[in-house]
Curated annotation (Swiss-Prot):
Coiled coil: none annotated. P cell-type specific protein which involved in agglutination during conjugation. It comes from Schizosaccharomyces pombe (strain 972 / ATCC 24843). It holds the Pfam family DIPSY. The keyword Signal applies. Residues 617-796 are annotated as: 5 X 36 AA approximate tandem repeats. This is P cell-type agglutination protein map4. It is found in: Cell surface. Residues 253-264 have a biased composition (Polar residues). Residues 136-174, 253-333, 408-432 are annotated as: Disordered. One of its GO terms (cellular component) is external side of fungal-type cell wall.
């Protein structure tokens, strides 16, 4: 054996020192205690200057863990209430896993099958609150490229849904108010027209609705003019007084709360809106000579809200077909579009309500005179059947003008004080006496209300009253509120609604003498509705209502009981409508001349309401067998019942997917139209037999429970097991038997899979001399006692090999023994003791391993069983843990360690107990080992490898 091999052996022993120091009670040069006690850390060793290295020979079991993870994509998501999910675990994937264990020379391999739970992704939307509204509508998956939106809170009463797609966003509002929580409205303004020739006259309108407050935003296209109208709930309005008068550009709305439902067989053509105006009177007493003044405020806010509701009617549905597209159209257009739209003009009502206030001694009584004039316009049918291409209307795209003009009816009645309608009330209050020099005042409220409804993406434009030339009248300024951005939803047909109103309030001061004041104004209020048919160019449908000769006359007299009266006249002189396509300079229009409507009263209250509504029907999407149906709830006109978008599921059979024998059936629950029972999508499982998978002897059966149509009992999928015997696997002598419990059809007792173990003898495995016998307990059929597997270990025979039984790498060509040169004992050879320390002794072939090899990769000596010897270190070997061993050509082993990028030789010695020590300076050993335990035996020893 040469010195190089000896050096390697010492190196391995050195590494083992760190771990085994506790067991060997190594002594520190500073005290007589253990060199490394159980609480000494590596840093403690460094401080003491005592280092050792360890390369453990302990064989540890290798454990292979197979993790099957299932992504829970609904953990932070609240799915739609109508979207049901099955709690049944489906198994759709499997993999074969082989687990092996090593023990001495006996290897056992067991192969099993792992069934991975099937995970289906359920699309859902998280909500900011737990009581979220109805499901959010989504676009057609075949044409929409938007991704699932996420939520971010914008304020306390609204929730904004945003998407990473720049062209898609949704603004919707919900409420935690249980009375209106089922209402959710989406607004989808279209993109700006391609031409801006008429943009100066356009205004965009957004409505953001909640249970208690909404904002109606009117914005000029060029962003030069902005008006915001508050939406005030009834409870808020009732507490208001004259001191909080509404500004001329603001409107007062009354909120109508209604539940949401759906009637699949009926088209909803209705609007439910409320129009009412508070009557407020103010009387004040002043003195021109500087005496004190008195003021009285009378608030006649209605206690009950008047409601006008149009009943649902049946109209033609919106259908979809598939004509071919023109090659000139952009690729972003839908593949087809053919839409027939029925536009119905509902009753236009002009109501003039007059009130006469009579001052008597201490009592004021309010009477109202109601004049009602109504007009009706018949339906207009527009047929959009051909895509728009270019700057003109193609054939089939021309609208049809109204078939008749409105017919007018008028009636006037005096409302007695005892039979006032629920929308108003008689006011009786005590007022001070009015002297001759009293200056009285009253309030004129003018309200204009419009309501629009249709089922296409739209933009509503409205211009407030443009002229109010009243003499001696003060106007309050408009409020400035934040502007709410527009919203857009691509490729989705919505049923949307906008309700607008402008209100002007004027206070006229009348001197004590008898005088008359007349006020008048001419104004035109155009209402423009811009629609976009899917991805086609912008189409503008506009209607305007023109009024003229709006006047008021106020007269007072000098009397103890003064009478205050006013007269006014208003005329709805013109109603016009037009349809203009973007890029076209021409417009198709119709106009109607309306006769003047006049009335006289002391307090003038004027309101005009109009309704433009596209007939609503279900939007359907036809699916084929194997597809999944779904239903999306969409917003409908304000005040009406919410409708739904229904996917047409083939009738009367289930939507099915045919599977072959051996496949697994599954059922998915889908949402159905609101109000009906949820249906399911059923995988067609062959009937009448079970879905089976034929197995051969030795296979494992399994059963999977699947969902069945709603209302029936869940079924199972059964693997066909050969009958009547057990499913068995034939093994030969030496194999291991096992039993696996499997699921059986629901209601039966679980069965087992039995490995056929030969009887009556043990299952044995023949091993060679040197192996270790062991017994393993295995499972037996259910109800029997567990048995064992016995390994037959032959009686060991004597071996003439120089290598130990654990040898894994030594051969006659690469192994050597290590001789210790200059030791006080001669001859001296290296062997490993029970703690793997390198020991120099005369009998190098006993008490442990004594044959080594040199590992050139790690530059270390290792034993035939892979153990690195441990060497005793001195205090100053701070780099000793990284030393290397080099074997010279003559076999001498050179110990070196790196320091400052250089290799320094290490010197050796032997201790009294024969352990080999390593140091960089032998003189340092003297003070440390001169004790009764670890005295040095010889210094400057050399290790040399002796080849066989």
């Amino acid at each position: 054996m040469n010195s190089y091999a000896i050096l390697l052996s010492l190196f391995f022993s050195f590494e083992r020192l760190l771990t085994l120091a506790n067991a060997n009670s190594l002594y520190s040069p500073f005290n007589n205690s253990s060199f490394v006690d159980s609480d000494t850390s590596f840093s403690d060793l460094s401080r003491n200057g005592l280092l050792s290295l360890l390369d453990s020979n302990t064989t540890s079991a290798s454990v292979q863990t197979i993790a099957i993870s299932q992504t829970d994509n609904a953990a932070s998501c609240i799915p739609s209430a109508s979207l049901l999910s099955s709690s049944v675990v489906l198994y759709s994937a499997k993999e074969t896993v082989t687990v092996s264990s090593y023990w001495s020379l006996v290897s056992t391999s067991v192969t099993g099958t792992v069934y991975v739970p099937y995970t289906s992704s359920v699309a859902c939307f998280p909500y900011a609150t737990s009581d979220a509204p109805n499901p959010i509508p989504r676009g057609d998956s075949a044409t929409s490229t938007s991704i699932a939106p996420t939520y971010s809170a914008s304020d306390s009463s609204a929730t904004t849904i945003t998407s990473s797609s720049p062209s898609t966003s949704i603004i919707g509002t919900g409420s935690t108010d249980t009375s209106v929580s089922s209402t959710l409205t989406y607004h989808t303004p279209i993109a700006s027209p391609t031409t801006s020739s008429n943009s100066d006259n356009e205004y965009t309108v957004d409505v953001i609705t909640s249970s208690s407050l909404s904002s109606f935003v009117i914005t000029n296209v060029d962003s030069t003019t902005t008006s915001v109208i508050n939406y005030i709930g009834a409870s808020t309005l009732e507490s208001s007084s004259l001191t909080n008068t509404v500004s001329p550009t603001e409107s007062t709305f009354y909120e109508t709360k209604s539940s949401t439902s759906s009637v699949p067989t009926q088209t909803i053509d209705s609007s439910s809106f409320t129009s009412s105006t508070p009557v407020s009177l103010t009387s004040s007493s002043t003195s021109s000579s500087g005496s004190s003044q008195d003021s009285t405020t009378i608030d006649s806010t209605p206690s009950t809200i008047a409601t006008s509701t149009l009943q649902p009617t049946t109209s033609s549905p919106i259908t979809t077909s598939a004509p071919s597209l023109s090659s000139a159209l952009p690729t972003t257009y839908p593949s087809s579009l053919s839409t027939e739209v029925e536009v119905e003009y509902f009753t236009k009502t002009i109501t003039d309500t007059s009130s006469i206030v009579t001052y008597s001694t201490g009592v004021e009584t309010l009477y109202e005179t109601e004049t009602i004039t109504s007009s009706e316009i018949s339906s207009i049918i527009y047929n959009f059947s051909t895509p728009i291409s270019g700057s003109s209307f193609p054939d089939g795209f021309k609208p049809i003008n109204p078939t008749s003009f409105p017919s007018l009816t008028s009636s006037t009645k005096k409302i007695p004080s005892t039979t006032l309608p629920t929308s108003s009330k008689m006011i009786t209050t005590t007022t001070p006496s009015v002297s001759n020099n009293t200056q009285s005042s009253f309030l004129i409220i003018s309200t204009f209300t419009s309501s629009y409804e249709h089922s296409e993406p739209f933009k509503v434009s409205s211009v407030p009253l443009t002229s109010n030339n009243f003499s001696s009248i003060s106007h309050s300024s408009a409020s400035s509120l934040p502007i709410t951005p527009s919203s857009y939803l691509s490729n989705t047909t919505l049923h949307s609604s906008v309700q607008s109103s402008q209100s002007s309030q004027f206070t006229v001061s009348v001197p004590s003498s008898t005088q008359s004041y007349s006020t008048s104004s001419n104004f035109t209020t155009p209402i423009t509705i811009s629609t976009s048919l899917s991805s086609f160019p912008t189409t503008i449908v506009s209607s305007s209502f023109q009024y003229s000769s709006l006047s008021s006359n106020v007269t007072t007299t000098n009397a103890q009981s003064s009478s205050l009266s006013s007269s006014n006249s208003s005329a709805l002189t013109h109603i016009s409508s037009s349809i203009v396509s973007s890029g076209s300079s021409s417009a198709l229009s119709s106009s109607t001349i309306v006769s003047s409507i006049n009335s006289s009263s002391s307090v003038f209250i004027s309101s005009v309401s109009s309704s433009l509504q596209y007939s609503s029907s279900y939007v359907t999407e036809t699916t084929t067998s194997g597809s999944v149906g779904f239903t999306t709830t969409i917003a409908t006109p304000v005040g009406s019942t919410a409708g739904t978008v229904v996917v047409d599921i083939p009738t009367p059979s289930w939507v099915t997917e045919t599977v072959t024998s051996g496949s697994v059936g599954f059922t998915t629950t889908i949402a159905t139209p609101v109000g009906s029972t949820a249906g399911t999508v059923l995988v067609d499982i062959p009937t009448p037999s079970w879905v089976t998978e034929t197995v051969t002897s030795g296979s494992v059966e399994f059963t999977t429970t699947i969902a069945t149509p709603v209302g029936t009992t869940a079924g199972t999928v059964v693997v066909d097991i050969p009958t009547p015997s057990w499913v068995t696997e034939t093994v030969t002598s030496g194999s291991v038997g096992f039993t696996t419990t499997i699921a059986t059809p629901i209601g039966t007792t679980a069965g087992t899979v039995l490995v056929d173990i030969p009887t009556p003898s043990w299952v044995t495995e023949t091993v060679t001399s040197g192996s270790v016998g062991f017994t393993t307990t295995i499972a037996t059929p259910v109800g029997t006692t567990a048995g064992t597997v016995l390994i037959d270990v032959p009686t060991p025979t004597a071996s003439s090999s120089p290598f130990p039984s654990c040898n894994t790498q030594c051969t006659n060509e690469n192994s050597f023994r290590i001789q210790v040169i200059n030791d006080d004992i001669y001859p001296s050879y290296v062997h490993l003791d029970s703690n793997n320390y390198a020991i120099a002794a005369a009998r190098g072939d006993s008490d442990g391993e004594n044959v080594f090899i040199y590992d050139s990769d790690i530059k270390r000596i290792v034993s035939c069983c892979g153990v690195k010897p441990i060497y005793r270190l001195d205090q100053d070997d701070t780099e000793g843990y990284s030393f290397e061993i080099y074997k010279d050509n003559d076999g001498q082993l050179q110990f070196k360690y790196p320091l400052n990028d250089a290799l320094y030789p290490m010197e050796l010695l032997t201790l009294t107990d024969g352990r080999i020590g390593i140091t960089t300076n032998l003189t340092l050993y003297k003070p440390y080992y001169l004790n009764n335990v670890e005295n040095e035996r010889a210094a400057n020893v050399v290790l040399r490898a002796l080849e066989y």
